[in-house]
Amino acid sequence: MTATQTSASVVHDLGALAHRLSHSARTRCVCEPPQVLADRPDGTVVRSGAIVAKAHAADTDREALAARIALAAAPQLTGILLPPLTAPEHPEPSDASPRPGLPEPPTPTPRPVTLWPFGAPVDPTDPEAAPWAEAAVLLARLHRTRPPFRLPPMRGPAKAARAVARMRAARPGDPAVLPVLACWRALPAWARGEGPPPAPRAGYLCHGDLHLGQLVRHPAPDGPWLLIDVDDAGAGDPAWDLARPAAWYAAGLLDPEDWSAFLDAYRSAGGPAVPADGNPWPELDVPARALTVQTAALALAKCAAEKRDPDEPEQLMIESCARIATLPPELTTDHAS
């Protein structure tokens, strides 16, 4: 695996690694072919049996990633975050013969690789069973947990800034981006990744990229729900983790019943991002606007790359930016998040 390695070869090597670690060389192999779970520039994920191997982006801050992986393994996060796997020191005896038809294990790579147990994901074909309340309880528990050691900042605002930069590069001079940029410029500097959040809101343990794709049941298929993907986790404003469902609700993409179940469960579990009762929007307003911009910016960039018009959900988020750009944001010192 090299820095310029193709996506296909990354998938090949990850599948080989996951397969090699899924059972010993002496065990008769009845495994299905490795399954690609995700293949994007920021991460390639391949499963073989009970093992999931993930190649992170080549430009990943390895020190920060190490801290985030250690966080997922910390006992304080048991039952909240899916813990990583530690590869066996000697997964196969040194004199073992290669198994016929299997690829050789990968060579060291400039892309950091982590190993995880497989968990059963949310079923996208059954929206009525979507675990919004369970996700909210996990978030509340995460936010209430004292960081066990010094962590990097939560990467949510930085990801929003990258999405806007990607949109600008994909559509230079295109008037379609103007409402998104107007909404972006109206945000405070911290929400654009240009500084820390207000001090009273800055020290909470956050996931950084909450959506239903970040939940799995482990052990599969019926274990408890756990949060996965700590690539963006860190210290920050916990309201950011509620911002995507809040933005979807505001745009009409999330049913009011699902939003109420999510918010009520978070409050009942003692989540600190919003008051225990009353209006949650003073705390959610800025993060929800930022996630609206991020989603719209990524949609416009993808549409440009794929030479297509936005689909209905994408168009709703773009229209939300145009609507938000005409409204005064709630940016008082009392509600600076």
What is each model feature region?
Residues M1-E32:
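Juxta-kinase regulatory segment immediately upstream of eukaryotic protein kinase catalytic domains
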Residues T2-Q5, R166-R171, P175-A176, T295-S337:
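ATP/Mg2+ or Mg2+-diphosphate-binding catalytic cores
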Residues Q35-K54, L85, A189-L242, G252:
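Active-site acidic catalytic loop and adjacent metal/ATP-binding pocket
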Residues V52-T109, A120, T125-L142:
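A conserved alpha-helical element in kinase catalytic cores
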Residues T109-D126, R144, R162-P172, A290-D311:
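A glycine-centered beta->alpha junction motif in the catalytic cores
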Residues D123-L181, P200-G203, L316:
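A cross-family kinase active-site recognition segment
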Residues A239-P272, R289-K307:
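Active-site activation/catalytic loop segments of kinase-like enzymes and analogous catalytic loops
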Residues V274-A288:
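All-alpha amphipathic helical-bundle segments outside canonical DNA-binding/catalytic cores
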